[in-house]
Structures are given as structure tokens and as C-alpha cells.
């Protein structure tokens, strides 16, 4: 017998049957071995055939295993095919000729095995299999095709293997409801109704709901809410992963796709094929000289044999499909825009129930409104409704996590009880009177805590069971509604009326009663079961770092103390501190323009007066981290070409993928202080890109992405006009500001200066300011020494000397650091290393005989 004439699947099954016979020490490979291998085979033809014949494959496998275990076992012999198996295979070859097959397939072996006179024949009789019903099932499975290649079995029932039936999922209620999008669905239906080129392609940004539109179409078809031409059609989604997975050899992928297209052609327009991410079809399966999937689709699309709905993003459509003009002309574009905030709220209200059932929590309407509005305002790089749905989902998930875990009061009590038990064990070993008294007190506390714990646990369990009861009713009600829809479609009026007038009203009443009871006993002091706008804001704050949550009393107090905190570190610059503090207060009170940065400032003044220090102090105040500052030294951007480093190199240049210094930093940390240091040293062209940041709070980077600057504080520092400030230190602040601004307006363009919220001129520092700064810096030194065990106090005379030594009206506070190093740190370091100063002893630093001394 020529084994080359067997299909691939039958050859694999024969090899498997031989392995099985060897494993079970059987001398011969019997027909039962082969049938067992065929039934267990993945993607084989036999298992689906038995399903068609209403025979349980699991029952059949169990029966076959019983027969296999009864076969005689022999050791030390070579396994060979039995006469009975050879006879059946010959019979199968004859049947293949009768069916006009070029290759011998697995299902014909089943037909031949019906003539078996042994245990297999008896088994088939027990299952009620006859030649007539098996032949009929084979014809149904083959769909009128003969076996003309070795892989014929793999390409059968291609639609079942490589597609997902969306209409079936809509019937069983597995698809989420689709709210709105009527215009897009109507346009899609309009294109599908055409005679030729009836293939719409949905194009839109990621997350706007392209796939949801097709799901909405499937739901409308199921409910009969479509024109006559689309009624009773099926919407199948092509599973590209299943189509490509396991296609090892050249041509196998094309074979599978061709099988799908052939089956679709046989359906004669009764199937609408949905290809999500349709751009993946262009180039899919393309190897040297092979056709890609896109070219295989073209003839079917042009002839109208294939009703296809595609979905892809704008960028990918341009990149892949527009390049192939022949493929593009076969599709009709349907643009899917981002829904408005109002439409998003409607969509979320429709989805609310599904998410409530999944997470077992209640989602309030203010939470839905907050999710739509806050995500629209604060998440700029993604689209509605996807980003709003994500917020609802995550907020509900975090609440569900809290419900499932032990509440904090219970957890604290449990830990305290464990702590008391450990203490009790230790005290039991002691015999003295004090320990006994302590033990008695401990027992009293333990009893009280245990009672408190059990009472709280009862409350928690009662709350949890009430919550689970409500959720169970919601799930039952949802299932009853799905069952009613199915009964309506099947014209089962008896079941429909039973559900509509009996089951559903009863469940609704039970649910209302349960919710009413919950509200009456509304003392949920352990479990939070409602998603409110606060939970939404909390999730968004964690994701973006922008403080959106309602301000707690502590934060309000902190903000009102803001000027005081800034003054404690930035000395002698009242106007600057006030301007910055007011900008932050306006923003957190919700009064600032939402389309501009929180504040944009130009700090002018001589070197070393606190311009950069104020920026650092602000970052430290807002984020408790001095490094939460995007600092860019503008002296690095002196050449014209270096401007691109801020926003990223243009396409075609090295470093295009890396993004810009400024844009990438703000994308990663949208709520931050942006410090552009020494701004006058940058090339004038740099200020052109800052115009849109200061005006609209946005900047487009080299890759075309819009970066949101609306939650940043933009601070620019400059030394322009510093000489005027030094020379005219005695005149009024306003007069000095006017003089400095005349110099600034000569250097910067009017449109740049006009966009800055406030230009702040810093005063030169006098002796008193330097003394206060010296005190701050010396306190830092004292803290560093305290960490090493030295308790240091500095006398007023020493402080006066250091502040005088570090005072220079031209250079501000910077010489002070050098003075502290030379006058104090250097001699201190020598004395510590030489052992003259010992830790854990008080150290007094004083000024005597024209130099600073440290004594213990």
C-alpha cells in the first residue's frame, strides 16, 4: 500500500497508533489503535464528525480505552500492522476511488470501519452508527468537495476554525451594548448594501470605538433592526492569530486563507467578514515570491463575493493601505471621530450595568460624568471613550480589591491581638508581682479587643453577604433579560411572556427591596461599595501625578502656608514669592485658565539672589522632592540647530526615535516645574517654540505628538539688566522694574514677553539677607554633623563673621558657600580627623582672635 497517498492527518494518526501499540506492549497495530489516535487528534476530521453524529467524543474515548486495555500484551517483539487493519485500509482506498478523491482521508477509514466484525463494529452498533448516516455526515462536512491534496483535512470548516461569530456572541449577550454611533453604523450599512465595492473600512484613532461599531452592527442584525438586504446575515471576525499560527511550510498560510475565501464564496453573501487591524493583511504571509494576504483578497473584494468590513487607525491606513492603490479602491472609507464628552457620558451610562455586575460595586452617575470630563481634560494622548472607560474600570477594580481584602480597622485589631498574645507568652514566664499585674491587665485588654474584633467581624460579614446578595440578583436579572431577547428572536412567546411578566418583575422587585434595605441600614462603615467622583480622581491622580482629588483640610492649610514656607528658604524676594504662590493657589482653587500652564514667570536679577533656589523650593513644596523639576540649561542651546534637541529631531535625522529633552520630560511627568535656566543665552529661535507653550499649554514634538504643558509651572531665569539692578538698588521696585524691562524688551520679542504671566525682578541681597541665608546654610551643616554624632551650636559672633566674609553685593549668596567652606568646614574637618573633636559631646563654634574656633 502506498502511504504517500494518505492525507497528512491520516499519516500522523498511523504514526501515533504505532507509538500507542508500542507503549501498551501490543504485538499488532489494531484498527482500535488508529481510531483512538484519530479521535484524539487536534484539528482532525474525526472528532467533528462524531459531534455531527451526536456521539460524545469523551464517551467514545473511554470505550476505546477499555477495548485497548483488553488487548493481549507481548514483550520483546516488533510491532506490526494487523491483518484486520490492512484489510480496512485497503477498503478505505477503494472508498476514496468511489468518492473521486486523489488522496485517502481519515473520515473514509471510519466508513470502512463500520464493516469491522470485531469489538469496533460492536461499539459502532451500540452508538447507532450506520453507513447511511455516516456517509451523510461526511458529505455535509466536505461541502461537496473532493480530497485533492494532502492537507485537505486542515482546510475544512475554515470559517469555524479561523473566525469568531459575532452574531452568535450577540445572541448570547456576550457583547457589550453599543450606545450612539448611529451615523457611523448607518454609513457602514449603506456601503454594505452596494452592489460592488461593498466593503467599508472604519478609520479612526485608537480607542474611539471602531470595533464597537461592528459589534453594534452584529447586535442590530440579531435584533432585525437592519434593511432587508442585511437581515439574517452573520458577522464573522477573522482571527489572524489562528490563521498564521502553526503555518510552518510555504504556502500553508495562503492555503488556509484561500479555504476561508472559498467557504465565504459558497455562503453567497450571507456572511460579512470583519477584519480588525486590516493593515496586518498587507504583507501577511509574504515570503520570497509568495503572494501576501492583501493580494489574495483583491479578486474576491472586486467581484463582490466577499462582504468585508475593515478597521484600522489613520496612520496605519496611510502607511499600508494607501500605498496599495488597487486594494484601497476596493474599500470605502468610514471615518470614526472621537465622541464628545456628552456622547461619552451616554456610552458610559449604557456600559455601567456590565461593570457593576463584573466588579460587584455600584457606579454612581457623578463618577461617570467625572470620568468623561476629567479624562478629556487631563489625558491628552489617548481618545474618548476608551480612556474614560479605563478610569471607571480601574476605580471599580480598586474598590473591589478593598471589599475582598480585610478592612483596615479589622486588620489593625488582629495585629494588636497577635502582639498582645506574644506579650502574654513572655510575661507568663515571669514570677514577680509587677509582671502578674501586667498579665492581668493584658488579659483584660485581650478580652476587650477580642470582643471588639468579633463584633466588627460580624458587621463586616453581614455587609459582605448583603452586597453579594444584591450582586447575585443583578446577575440573575441580566441573564433573564438575555433569555427574554433570545425567546423573542425564537418567537417563543410562552417563555417570553413568562420572563417578561413573571421572572423579570419579581427579580426587579427583589433587587429594589435589597437596595432599599441597604440604604436604610446605610452604616457601611467598613466597606465602600460606591464608585464616586473621588475614586475616579484618585485613579487619575495616581496615573498622571496631577493633584485632582478634592483637597483635604491638611492640604488646604499647607497651601495657605505656602508663602511662609517659600520665604523660609528664599530670603529677601517678597514680590517673587508672592507671584509664584498666587499662581499655584489660583490653579488649585480651580480659577486658572485650563488651557494655559499653571503659571509662566520670567525671573530677572543678578547672579546668586535666589532665582533658581525659588524654583527648587517650589518643586520641593509641591512634590516633596527637590528633584521633581525639569531643568534645562539654555546655555546648551546657543546654536540654531540645537533647537531640535528640545522637541526631538525631525524625520530622517539621527535620534528621531529618541524624542526631545523638554517634550519627553514633560510627557513622563505632566505635573512639574519646568525651569529654563539662563534663558537669554539661548538662540532667539528657541523662543519661537516656547510661544505655543506659554499661550496654549501645548507643544508638538518631532514625531507629531502633542505634549500637554497645562499642568506645569514654567519658570525662566535671566541675568538681563543685572547691572542696572546693582547700580540702582536704592530706587523703588517699580522704577527699577521699568528700567530692567527696557533692556529685556530689546533682547526678547514683544510676542514672547506678552505671553509671560509675570516678569519678576529680584532685589540684590544686603548684609541682613546674607546673614539670614548664612543661618539657613549653617543649620544644614549642623544637621549633617548631627547624623555623625556631633551636637554643634554656633555663636552669634561666628555667624556675623561668616556672613560678613561671604558678603559680596555683586555675586549675591554664592560667595557665602565658599566662605563657610574656608572659614568653618576646612578647620572642622581637620579637627574631626585628628581626634580633637569627639562624637557624642557638645561642640561650640565661636569667633575669637580673628578666626573661628571649635571647642568641646
UniProtKB/Swiss-Prot annotation:
Residues 3-144 form the Clp R domain. Residues 82-144 are annotated as: Repeat 2. ATP 2 binds at residues 605-612. It is found in: Cytoplasm. Residues 6-71 are annotated as: Repeat 1. Residues 157-338 are annotated as: NBD1. GO terms for biological process: cellular response to heat; protein refolding. Its main location: cytoplasm. Residues 389-523 form a coiled coil. Residues 555-764 are annotated as: NBD2. Pfam families: AAA, AAA_2, AAA_lid_9, Clp_N, ClpB_D2-small. One of its GO terms (molecular function) is ATP hydrolysis activity. InterPro entries: AAA+_ATPase, ATPase_AAA_core, Chaperonin_ClpB, Clp_ATPase_C, Clp_N_dom_sf, Clp_R_dom, ClpA/B, ClpA/B_CS1. Residues 339-545 are annotated as: Linker. GO terms for cellular component: cytoplasm. The Clp repeat (R) domain probably functions as a substrate-discriminating domain, recruiting aggregated proteins to the ClpB hexamer and/or stabilizing bound proteins. The NBD2 domain is responsible for oligomerization, whereas the NBD1 domain stabilizes the hexamer probably in an ATP-dependent manner. The movement of the coiled-coil domain is essential for ClpB ability to rescue proteins from an aggregated state, probably by pulling apart large aggregated proteins, which are bound between the coiled-coils motifs of adjacent ClpB subunits in the functional hexamer. Belongs to the ClpA/ClpB family. Homohexamer. The oligomerization is ATP-dependent. This is Chaperone protein ClpB. It comes from Haemophilus ducreyi (strain 35000HP / ATCC 700724).
Amino acid at each position: 500500500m502506498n502511504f504517500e497517498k494518505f492525507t497528512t492527518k491520516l499519516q500522523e494518526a498511523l504514526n501515533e497508533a504505532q507509538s500507542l501499540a508500542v507503549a501498551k506492549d501490543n504485538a499488532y497495530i489494531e484498527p482500535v489503535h488508529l481510531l483512538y489516535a484519530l479521535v484524539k487528534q487536534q484539528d482532525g476530521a474525526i472528532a467533528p464528525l462524531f459531534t455531527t453524529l451526536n456521539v460524545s467524543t469523551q464517551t467514545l474515548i473511554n470505550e476505546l480505552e477499555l477495548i485497548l486495555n483488553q488487548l493481549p500484551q507481548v514483550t520483546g517483539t516488533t510491532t506490526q500492522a494487523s491483518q484486520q487493519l490492512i484489510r480496512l485500509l485497503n477498503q478505505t482506498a477503494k472508498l476514496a476511488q468511489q468518492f473521486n478523491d486523489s488522496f485517502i482521508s481519515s473520515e473514509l477509514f471510519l466508513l470502512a470501519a463500520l464493516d469491522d466484525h470485531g469489538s469496533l463494529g460492536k461499539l459502532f452498533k451500540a452508538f447507532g452508527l450506520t453507513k447511511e448516516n455516516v456517509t451523510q455526515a461526511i458529505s455535509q462536512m466536505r461541502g461537496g468537495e473532493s480530497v485533492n491534496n494532502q492537507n485537505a483535512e486542515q482546510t475544512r470548516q475554515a470559517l469555524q476554525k479561523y473566525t469568531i461569530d459575532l452574531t452568535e456572541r450577540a445572541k448570547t449577550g456576550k457583547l457589550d451594548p453599543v450606545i450612539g454611533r448611529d451615523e457611523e453604523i448607518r454609513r457602514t450599512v449603506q456601503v454594505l448594501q452596494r452592489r460592488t465595492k461593498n466593503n467599508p473600512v472604519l478609520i479612526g484613532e485608537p480607542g474611539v470605538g471602531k470595533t464597537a461599531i461592528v459589534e453594534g452592527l452584529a447586535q442590530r442584525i440579531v435584533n432585525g433592526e437592519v434593511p432587508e438586504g442585511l437581515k439574517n446575515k452573520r458577522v464573522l471576525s477573522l482571527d489572524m492569530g489562528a490563521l498564521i499560527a502553526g503555518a510552518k511550510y510555504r504556502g500553508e498560510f495562503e492555503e488556509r486563507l484561500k479555504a476561508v475565501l472559498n467557504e465565504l464564496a459558497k455562503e453567497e453573501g450571507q456572511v460579512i467578514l470583519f477584519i480588525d487591524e486590516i493593515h496586518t493583511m498587507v504583507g501577511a504571509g509574504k515570503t520570497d515570491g509568495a503572494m501576501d494576504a492583501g493580494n489574495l483578497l483583491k479578486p474576491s473584494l472586486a467581484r463582490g463575493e466577499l462582504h468585508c468590513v475593515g478597521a484600522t487607525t489613520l496612520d496605519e491606513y496611510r502607511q499600508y493601505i494607501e500605498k496599495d492603490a488597487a486594494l484601497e479602491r476596493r474599500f470605502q472609507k468610514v471615518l470614526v471621530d472621537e465622541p464628545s464628552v456628552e456622547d461619552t457620558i451616554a456610552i458610559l451610562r449604557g456600559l455601567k450595568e456590565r461593570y457593576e455586575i463584573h466588579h460587584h460595586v455600584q457606579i454612581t452617575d457623578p463618577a461617570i460624568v467625572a470620568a468623561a470630563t476629567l479624562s478629556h481634560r487631563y489625558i491628552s494622548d489617548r481618545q474618548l471613550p476608551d480612556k474614560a472607560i479605563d478610569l471607571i474600570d480601574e476605580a471599580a477594580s480598586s474598590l473591589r480589591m478593598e471589599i475582598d481584602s480585610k478592612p483596615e480597622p479589622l486588620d489593625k485589631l488582629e495585629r494588636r491581638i497577635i502582639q498582645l498574645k506574644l506579650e502574654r507568652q513572655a510575661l507568663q514566664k515571669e514570677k514577680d508581682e509587677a509582671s502578674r499585674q501586667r498579665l492581668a491587665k493584658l488579659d483584660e485588654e485581650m478580652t476587650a479587643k477580642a470582643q471588639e474584633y468579633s463584633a466588627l467581624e460580624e458587621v463586616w460579614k453581614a455587609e459582605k453577604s448583603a452586597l453579594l446578595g444584591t450582586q447575585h440578583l443583578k446577575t440573575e436579572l441580566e441573564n433573564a433579560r438575555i433569555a427574554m431577547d433570545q425567546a423573542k428572536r425564537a418567537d417563543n412567546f410562552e417563555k417570553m411572556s413568562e420572563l417578561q411578566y413573571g421572572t423579570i418583575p419579581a427579580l426587579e422587585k427583589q433587587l429594589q427591596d435589597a437596595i432599599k434595605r441597604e440604604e436604610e441600614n446605610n452604616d457601611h462603615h467598613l466597606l465602600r461599595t460606591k464608585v464616586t467622583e473621588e475614586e475616579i480622581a484618585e485613579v487619575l491622580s495616581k496615573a498622571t501625578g496631577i493633584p485632582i482629588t478634592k483637597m483635604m483640610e491638611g492640604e488646604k492649610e499647607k497651601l495657605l502656608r505656602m508663602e511662609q514656607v517659600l520665604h523660609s528658604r528664599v530670603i529677601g524676594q517678597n514680590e517673587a514669592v508672592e507671584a509664584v504662590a498666587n499662581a499655584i493657589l489660583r490653579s488649585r482653587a480651580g480659577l486658572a485658565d485650563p488651557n494655559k500652564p499653571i503659571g509662566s514667570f520670567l525671573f530677572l536679577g543678578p547672579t546668586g539672589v535666589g532665582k533658581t533656589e525659588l524654583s527648587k523650593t517650589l518643586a520641593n513644596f509641591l512634590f516633596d522632592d527637590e528633584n521633581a523639576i525639569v531643568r534645562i540649561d539654555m546655555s546648551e542651546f546657543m546654536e540654531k540647530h540645537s533647537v531640535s534637541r528640545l522637541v526631538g529631531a525631525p524625520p530622517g535625522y539621527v535620534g528621531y526615535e529618541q524624542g526631545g529633552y523638554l517634550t519627553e520630560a514633560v510627557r513622563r511627568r505632566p505635573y512639574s516645574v519646568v525651569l529654563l535656566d539662563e534663558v537669554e543665552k539661548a538662540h532667539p529661535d528657541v523662543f519661537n517654540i516656547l510661544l505655543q507653550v506659554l499661550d496654549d499649554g501645548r507643544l508638538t514634538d518631532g514625531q507629531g505628538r502633542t505634549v500637554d504643558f497645562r499642568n506645569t509651572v514654567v519658570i525662566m531665569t535671566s541675568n538681563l539688566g543685572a547691572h542696572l539692578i546693582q547700580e540702582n538698588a536704592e530706587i523703588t521696585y517699580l522704577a527699577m522694574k521699568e528700567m530692567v524691562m527696557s533692556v529685556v524688551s530689546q533682547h526678547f520679542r514683544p510676542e514672547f514677553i506678552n505671553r509671560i504671566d509675570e516678569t519678576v525682578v529680584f532685589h540684590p541681597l544686603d548684609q541682613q539677607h546674607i546673614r539670614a541665608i548664612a543661618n539657613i546654610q549653617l543649620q544644614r551643616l549642623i544637621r549633617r554633623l548631627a547624623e555623625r554624632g556631633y551636637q554643634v551650636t554656633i555663636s552669634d559672633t561666628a555667624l556675623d563673621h561668616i556672613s560678613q566674609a561671604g558678603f559680596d553685593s555683586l555675586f549675591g549668596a554664592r560667595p557665602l558657600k565658599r566662605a563657610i567652606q574656608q572659614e568653618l568646614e576646612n578647620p572642622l574637618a581637620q579637627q574631626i580627623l585628628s581626634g580633637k573633636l569627639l562624637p557624642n559631646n557638645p561642640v561650640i563654634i565661636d569667633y575669637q582672635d580673628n578666626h573661628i574656633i571649635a571647642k568641646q
